[in-house]
Design a protein with these regions (language model features):
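Conserved tyrosine-mediated DNA breakage-rejoining catalytic core shared by Y-recombinases
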Residues: 12, 59, 113-149
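Short, contiguous acidic/charged loop-to-helix segments that flank catalytic cores in large enzymes
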Residues: 85-87, 125-135, 168-177, 195-202
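N-terminal core-binding DNA-recognition domain of tyrosine recombinases/integrases
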Residues: 1-68, 83
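A short, basic/aromatic helix-end/turn motif that makes direct DNA contacts
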Residues: 113-118, 222-228
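Basic, Lys/Arg- and aromatic-enriched nucleic-acid-binding interface segment
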Residues: 51, 56-108, 112
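Short, basic (Lys/Arg/His-rich) helix/loop patches that form interaction surfaces
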Residues: 82, 86-88, 182-223
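Active-site/catalytic core of tyrosine-dependent DNA strand-transfer enzymes
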Residues: 77, 140-195
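Short alpha-helical segment immediately N-terminal to, or the first helix within
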Residues: 21, 99-100, 114, 210-211, ...
């Protein structure tokens, strides 16, 4: 939660950052990308400032791995939607996964930050926090049903994920919620006929994969998901 001085960067700090990225549900290749970028910045600073190299990235994962399957079929999506779940946390995690899928793979951060004002004239209109691109999605009853089940905690946000009046910062709330949801989704993976572990990112990748199987042009899928061109 604070800035880290160059002299404080060691294997312990880098290891803690790597663990944080893993708990965020990022893939190994994405973690490697972040680590390599951070290492390049560190090496540049060491060279320009002529300071000792403490080699903080000696134990960090900086390789690339073969990408594993990260999408589930429409059949599996239906199985997940039809599950009779016992606990609130299970229902909440499942429904947010489905909400992401219904909204063309919306990221968890964007879902959490949605406000009631984002729904206008039958459309969900929002800007991706990652790219700033504005997206418009037709508002469906399936989305409204989920919103109705998890009402706003503060009267401002669309879903009951973040609370402006809580003691913890919105960033802390997002991190806690995302970790809990991904942990719960991992357990739900065993209840349906799939061979991968569910995360919020799987919802995003599943929408893109299933759209592609319906012969939706890749360019349209990319635009729909808010990718930078």
């Amino acid at each position: 939660q604070k800035d880290i001085l160059l002299c404080e960067l060691d294997e312990l700090v880098v290891g803690a950052y790597e663990s944080y990225l893993k708990h965020q549900g990022l893939t190994l290749n994405t973690i490697s990308f972040y680590m390599r970028r951070l290492r390049a910045i560190y090496n540049s600073a060491v060279k320009e400032l002529e300071i000792p190299d403490r080699k903080p990235f000696a134990g960090a994962f900086t390789r690339t791995t073969k990408t594993s399957k990260r999408a589930i079929s429409q059949k599996a999506i239906r199985q997940l939607a039809q599950l009779k779940l016992e606990t609130y946390n299970q229902q909440f995690a499942r429904d947010l996964f489905l909400f992401s899928y219904y909204t063309r793979g919306m990221s968890f951060v964007d879902i959490a930050c949605l406000e009631k004002s984002n729904i206008r004239n039958g459309y969900l209109i929002y800007k991706r926090r990652k790219t700033g691109q504005e997206l418009r999605i037709a508002w469906r009853q399936s989305m409204q049903d989920i919103v109705d089940r998890y009402p706003s905690l503060d009267g401002k946000h669309l879903l009951g994920i973040l609370d402006n009046h809580a003691e913890k910062s919105l960033r802390q709330q997002r991190h806690y919620r995302q970790c809990l949801i991904n942990k719960t989704l991992k357990k739900l993976s065993k209840l349906i006929d799939i061979d991968i572990t569910l995360t919020m990112y799987v919802a995003r990748h599943s929408w893109a994969t299933n759209a592609k199987e319906k012969n939706v042009p890749v360019s349209v899928i990319s635009d729909s998901m808010g990718h930078n061109s």
